[in-house]
């Protein structure tokens, strides 16, 4: 397969980074290059798919195909090619308004690239999924509650779980109370979108970076497994959920102005 890669690169007059080699004389033969690079790629060489993604965008290539180019790029990314992962992530983010869940796919690829040391991916993630700063609306009071917290976990386990999510993923009050737990878990991130039930809700992502965060989310998802998270479910509408939260915070002695901080 290495020989196939080298042969394909030779015909393309390119290096493994997809750059044109000025030291190679003669015109490129992209058709032959595609043949050999495809064979190398099908045997698991990510570099072959990455170079193919470059060839298919060449205006001088008679079989130029932007869709095929992106398909090759994704195959390279799937095989762990960091530059391809970065490029897939940025492409998905640019197209987030045209394709459903493109922001989720963008975060996935950028996390993969970041794990391989990409500073560009890390910077992009900071813009795409910044850590929320919801302020203190009472979610931290439960940590010092002791016996009342244990009582809440017994009497209102769903509310207790939502407070736990709020602390770990910096959720606002409205996000914590209205989050669709089933749809939020995307594996690598939490998709927070309460816009359908809250006028000020904005879609955003919270990255899952640690094993502890993953473990907590798994526990919460299991708890909500057979629960309808919608307003017709057992938790009721936003006002009903908010009332239960306020009653609990009042028991803890949380100042009323804290309860009414903007959600």
Per-region residue spans from a language model:
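Conserved tyrosine-mediated DNA breakage-rejoining catalytic core shared by Y-recombinases
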Residues: 179-216
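TPR/TPR-like alpha-solenoid helical repeat scaffolds
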Residues: 87-91, 120-136
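Basic, Lys/Arg- and aromatic-enriched nucleic-acid-binding interface segment
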Residues: 133-169
């Amino acid at each position: 397969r290495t020989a196939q890669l080298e042969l394909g690169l030779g015909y393309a007059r390119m290096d493994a980074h997809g750059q044109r080699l000025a030291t190679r004389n003669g015109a490129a033969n992209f058709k032959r290059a595609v043949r050999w690079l495809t064979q190398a790629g099908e045997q698991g060489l990510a570099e072959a798919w990455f170079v193919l993604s470059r060839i298919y965008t060449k205006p001088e290539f008679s079989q130029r195909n932007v869709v095929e180019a992106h398909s090759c790029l994704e195959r390279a990314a799937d095989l762990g090619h960091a530059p391809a992962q970065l490029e897939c992530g940025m492409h998905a983010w640019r197209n987030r308004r045209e394709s459903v869940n493109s922001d989720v796919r963008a975060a996935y690829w950028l996390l993969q690239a970041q794990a391989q040391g990409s500073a560009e991916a890390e910077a992009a993630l900071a813009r795409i999924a910044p850590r929320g700063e919801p302020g203190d609306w009472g979610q931290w009071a439960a940590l010092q509650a002791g016996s009342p917290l244990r009582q809440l976990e017994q009497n209102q386990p769903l509310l207790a779980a939502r407070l736990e999510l709020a602390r770990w993923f910096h959720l606002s009050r409205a996000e914590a109370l209205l989050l669709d737990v089933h749809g939020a878990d995307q594996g690598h991130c939490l998709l927070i979108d309460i816009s359908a039930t809250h006028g000020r809700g904005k879609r955003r992502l919270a990255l899952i970076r640690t094993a502890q965060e993953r473990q907590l989310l798994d526990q919460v998802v299991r708890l909500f497994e057979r629960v309808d998270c919608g307003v017709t479910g057992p938790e009721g509408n936003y006002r009903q959920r908010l009332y239960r939260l306020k009653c609990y915070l009042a028991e803890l002695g949380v100042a009323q102005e804290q309860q009414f901080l903007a959600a």
